[in-house]
Amino acid sequence: MTMFKKAVKSFQWGTYQVTMETGEIARQAGGAVIVNVDDTVVMGTVVASKSAKPGQSFFPLTVDYLEKTYAAGKIPGGFFRREGRPSEGETLISRLIDRPLRPLFPEGFLNEVQVVVHVLSINPDVPSDIPALIAASAALAVSSIPFAGPVGAARVGYANGQYLLNPTRTEQATSELDLIVAGTQAAVLMVESEANQLSEEVMLGAVVYGHDQMQTAINAINDLVCEAGKPEWDWTAAPKDEPFIAKVTALAEAPLREAYQIRQKGARSDKLKEISKEVMAKLSEEGDVDAVAVSDIMFEIEAKIVRSQILNGEPRIDGRDTRTVRPIEIRNGVLPRTHGSALFTRGETQALVVATLGTARDEQIIDVLEGEYRDRFMFHYNMPPFATGETGRVGSPKRREIGHGRLAKRALIPVLPSAEDFAYSIRVVSEITESNGSSSMASVCGGCLAMMDAGVPVKAHVAGVAMGLILDGNRFAVLTDILGDEDHLGDMDFKVAGTANGITALQMDIKVQGITKEIMQVALAQAKEGRLHILSKMQEAMGSVRTELSAHAPRMVSFKIHPDKIREVIGKGGATIQALTKETGCSIDIKDDGTVTIASTSAEGMAEAKARIEGITAEAEVGKIYEGPVVKLLEFGALVNILPGKDGLLHISEISNERVKEVKDYLAEGQVVRVKLLAADERGRLRLSLKAAMADEGGTIAPLAGAAEVATEAAPATGESA
C-alpha cells in the first residue's frame, strides 16, 4: 500500500521514449509533472493565488527555469559551492516557456501565477528546453488554474531535404535548421529558430511539421489530465461596468481618434497623456474614480480605433500603408577608435552598433550542464530608458535585453566566417538610442554593418524586419515594420531576419490563441519583400567588407610549432610565456596541436614575439655556427648558450689550437663567442667548438689580459649565424 496516487503516461516521440508522471512529488503545488526524455528529467510546477491583488492591472505570470548542477553529476564552482543567479541560458529558456503559455490564460484573469521548472537529470545529447516546456504545460493542465491548454512543443531540424523531429545534439550539429515551435491542438503560438539561409517555403513547412508532431505530446497530456487532473476553479471574469465604459468612451473616443492622426511619436504620446488627464479630471468631478479601470478602458478604445482603421484600409498610425518600411538612414565608421561601428536609423528606431575584435583568450567560456565550451561570437543588446524618452533603472541586462541580443545573434551566426578563415573572436554591442518598434531587427542590420566596417568577412548582408498582425474574426491585416504602438495594440510580433538568399532567424509571438498557416504564409511573403528592401539600402551604404582592419584592431599571425616544444615556450610555471607577453606587448595563445597565435596592435612587437618563439623551438643544427654568451665556466671547458634554453659544452680542447691550461685564461662568463656545433646526441647534449668556428670564419682567440679584460680578436663573420 502506498501513500501516493501516482499517474504515469509514456509515449514514443520520434526517437525518444517519453514518460510523464504526477502525484508523487511536489504534491502541495497547484500542479506538478515530471517529464523524462531519455534520462533528461525535468520537474514542472505551478502555483496560483486564489484571488487577484486589489488594483492589479496586468497579469502577473512569472516563469523560472532552473538548472541544478547535480543533474550532470557536478558540484558548483565558486566559494559557496551552490547555484547562483540564473545564467543567460536559463533566462532564455524561461522566456521560451513563458511565451506560448501567456496567451492561454483567460482575459481578465489577474491572479498571480508562478511556473517553476527544475532540471533534475541531464542526458548531454538530449536538450532540456522541450521537456521543460512540456512539463510546464502539463503542470498547468493538471492543475485547477483556468488555462486554455495544453501546449505542445517540438524541435525541428532540417538535413538532406528532410525534417528531423527533436534531433539530438549530435544530429543538430549537421542540421541547417534549429526551430522550436509551440502551440495548442488547433494553432501555433510561438516559433523560435535559427536557419542557414533557408527559403520561406522550407521554414513554413518546418513550422507545420512541428505543429503536427507536437500533437503526440498534447494527446499524452490530455490523457494525464483525464486520469489525474484537478477540478478547474469556478472562476469568471468580473462583470464589466457598461455604463461607466460608455461614459469614458463618450469623453475619450473623439479626442483619441484625433490623437492617432498625429504621425510623430513624441507629439502623439504627449497628446495621449493630455487626453488621459482631461478625462480623469472630468470623471473626478463626479466623485472618486478608479484610475486603473479608466486606463484599461482607454486602452481598449485606442486598440479599437487603431485596429479598425487598419482593417478598413486606412493609413497606419504614422501614415504608412501595411507594406511600407519606414525611411532608412545608415552611417558607417561613426566612432573613430573602435574596430567597427554603424549607426542604423529606421524611422524613430535607432541603433548604434559597435564591433570589437579579440583573440582566442577573449572568447567567452560558458559552463553549462552538458559541459564547458567556448563561444567566439558575442552579441549584447542594451536599451537604456532614454531611448523611449523615459527615466528608469540602468544596470545589468533584463530578460528582454538578453532575449533580443540572442535573437540578433541567431540572425548573424549563419554568415560568420569560420575560425580557420578568420581567427578573431567577435563582440558586437547594440546600443539602442531611439526606440519605436523593431529595435532587435535594427540591431541585426546594424550588427552586420558594424562587422563589415570592422573587416569581418561575413558571407552576405543580413537584414531583419518585424511584422505585426491585426486579426478580427476572418479579417486580418499583416503589417510590415511595426511601430511600438502597433506591437502593443496588435496580435502578433513576427520577426524575420535573413539574407537575399534566405532566412537566418525567425521569432514569432502570438497574443491571441493561435494563427493559421495562411496568415503565416502571408506574413513570410510580406517579410521577404520588406527584408529585400532593407538589404538594398544596406548595400547602397556599404557594398562590401572593408579589406583592411582598423588601425586600433589587433593583428594576428599563426604558425605551428612541434607539440613537444609547447612546454619550452610556456616555461616553468608559465615564466617564459609571461615574460614574452610582457616584453613584447603581445597576446600569445598556444593550442594543444602546436598552433601558436600572436596578436598585437604593434607589428614590431608581433615580429619580435614570433622570432623569439621560433628561437625557443628551433632545433640545433650540426655544422652550423652560432653566437652566444658563456654561461658557466667548468674545469674541463665552458657552457655556451646557442639558442634559447639550449646550452652546449665547449670542451677545453676545442677552445684554441694552442694548449689551454686554464679555461678562465681564455673565457669569462658573459663573454659572447661564436662556436660551431660539432655533434648532438640522442639525449640532446651538444658539443661545441670555438677553434672550428674560427677556422671556418678566420680569426684567433688570445688569453684574457687581466682578471676582467676580454681580448677577443674575431674577423668579420663569413659563415652562417643564428
Swiss-Prot record:
SMART domains: KH, S1. Signal peptide: none annotated. It is found in: Cytoplasm. CDD domains: KH-I_PNPase, RNase_PH_PNPase_2, S1_PNPase. Its EC number is 2.7.7.8. Gene3D superfamilies: GHMP Kinase, N-terminal domain, K Homology domain, type 1, Nucleic acid-binding proteins. It catalyses: RNA(n+1) + phosphate = RNA(n) + a ribonucleoside 5'-diphosphate. Mg(2+) binds at residues 487, 493. Residues 554-613 form the KH domain. The keyword Ligase does not apply. Keywords: Cytoplasm, Magnesium, Metal-binding, Nucleotidyltransferase, RNA-binding, Transferase. Its cofactor is Mg(2+). Its main location: cytoplasm. Belongs to the polyribonucleotide nucleotidyltransferase family. This is Polyribonucleotide nucleotidyltransferase.
